[in-house]
Design a protein with these regions (language model features):
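Long, contiguous domain-sized segments
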Residues: 1-277
Length: 277
């Protein structure tokens, strides 16, 4: 049963009125509504997969959560949770998701994975091998999104009184490493809630392709970084902007709660519902 809990002492507090927009947003999302979505110019034929993790100090184990998106509007579904070392279950769910996608929309053009840490070669190989066995000859883009904000690099905008780079600013560190400034500074000075940028690493895997097609092009990198930026605006637990995309936030929230369930697994109802908001 979908529910929304409120501590009984909170409604009488003066500050409670400021929490109401967040509560209304979360309730609407939980019952299947769409508080807001991304405006897209063209329909994407991408399968987007988010993988986040949470380690419970009480339980002493790390769990990973996953979420799937079948469009570029930021509406996610098909959530699940696994043990940290159970990548085979994740690969199996990706295979099932691709099967449903093909039935509804035809063959995907790309698979994009937002991952909470650098994916090992043997782990990414399991995914690409699965695609090859299914007959897909499509590129796989792996976007490593560090949950910890990058503090080893500092950027300044000397034209801003607060020296904060404008939100959406991208700094290229190397061939495939970038900093994304994802704060609240737009055309006018705003509150600098997120002082440090998010560090991103991009990887393209395209088996059996021509050598030039295996290389990550800058236009592809920009599109992937723009997607990360936009998905950070799709957080429906609050009207406040986040610095991490929901491809990492939502699976992490699932991975934090599910280990406390009796069987440590997500029931069927919870796989298609934003109950965790």
């Amino acid at each position: 049963v979908t529910s929304q809990a409120i501590y009984n002492e909170n409604p009488g507090k003066n500050a409670f009125q400021f929490h109401l927009p967040n509560i209304k947003t979360a309730i609407l999302a939980k019952i299947g509504g769409i508080p807001w979505q991304l405006q897209t110019r063209k329909k994407s034929n991408d399968v987007i997969i988010g993988v986040g993790a949470f380690k419970s100090e009480k339980i002493g184990k790390r769990y990973i959560g996953s979420a799937f998106c079948f469009n570029n509007e930021g509406v996610f579904q098909n959530f699940d949770c696994y043990r940290d070392d159970d990548l085979d279950s994740l690969v199996g769910d990706i295979r099932k998701a691709l099967g449903h996608f093909v039935i509804e929309s035809g063959n995907p053009d790309r698979v994009i994975i937002h991952y909470y840490k650098t994916m090992k070669e043997r782990d990414s190989a399991k995914i690409t091998d699965m695609l090859y066995k299914l007959g897909f000859s499509i590129p796989v883009y792996i976007v490593t999104i560090n949950k910890t904000e990058a503090s080893d690099y500092v950027g300044f905008d000397t034209e801003d009184p607060g020296l904060m780079p404008k939100s959406g600013t991208i700094v290229r560190l190397s061939y495939n490493e970038f900093l994304l400034y994802n704060n609240a500074r737009y055309d006018k000075p705003g509150r600098y809630d997120f002082l440090f940028p998010v560090k991103l690493k991009l990887k393209k895997v395209y088996n059996n392709a021509a050598p030039e097609d295996k290389e990550l092009r800058m236009d592809e990198a920009r599109a992937l970084l723009n997607q990360v930026y936009k998905f950070s605006r799709m957080y429906w637990k609050s009207v406040k902007q986040q610095n991490l995309p929901i491809t990492i936030k939502y699976p992490e929230m699932v991975a934090e709660i599910v280990p406390h369930f009796r069987k440590e697994e997500l029931p069927a109802f919870g796989k298609t519902n934003l109950w965790f908001l």
